A protein has these predicted regions:
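Short, solvent-exposed loop/turn segments at secondary-structure boundaries
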Residues: 17-18, 51-53, 77-78
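Glycine-rich beta-strand-turn "strand-cap" elements at beta-sheet edges
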Residues: 42-57, 87-126
Length: 126
């Protein structure tokens, strides 16, 4: 399973209209791209842990998009609904990080740590 991980901070002064347009683009992508296996969106919780002060960026939101495999992720990245979402996302954010991770459950930890990495087979995107 692959997890497309997006950490971000909205642009200061982002209008309600721009927020709604971003949300509409997200809903369109989630409902229109069958390659998406799962999705979660969350807001950062600050609770006084020491590591909070060491973060260089205060990225308020995290989105996690789950895919079965690399081919599914590539389908998502190339889909017109993702292109629209990506365009709106880039215009709406002040800062962000986007990473893709190969995920395993606890019964497969050794396999991930010892096994080969998923190798990219062309193309990039968010």
């Amino acid at each position: 399973m692959l997890m497309h991980t997006v950490l971000f901070k909205p642009r200061p002064g982002l209008s309600d209209g721009d927020r709604h347009a971003l949300e509409a683009a997200l809903v369109s992508a989630l409902s229109g791209i069958p390659a998406i296996r799962g999705f979660r969106l969350g807001r950062r919780v600050k609770h006084g842990a020491g590591y909070e002060a060491s973060m260089r960026e205060d990225l308020e939101f995290a989105a996690f998009v789950e895919f079965d495999d690399l081919d599914s992720l590539k389908i998502y990245l190339q889909h017109p609904a993702h292109q629209e979402l990506g365009s709106r996302f880039m215009a709406a954010t002040a800062a962000g990080f986007i990473y893709d991770y190969q995920m395993v459950d606890r019964s497969n930890l050794g396999g991930l740590l010892e096994g080969p990495r998923v190798k990219p087979s062309g193309g990039t995107g968010s």
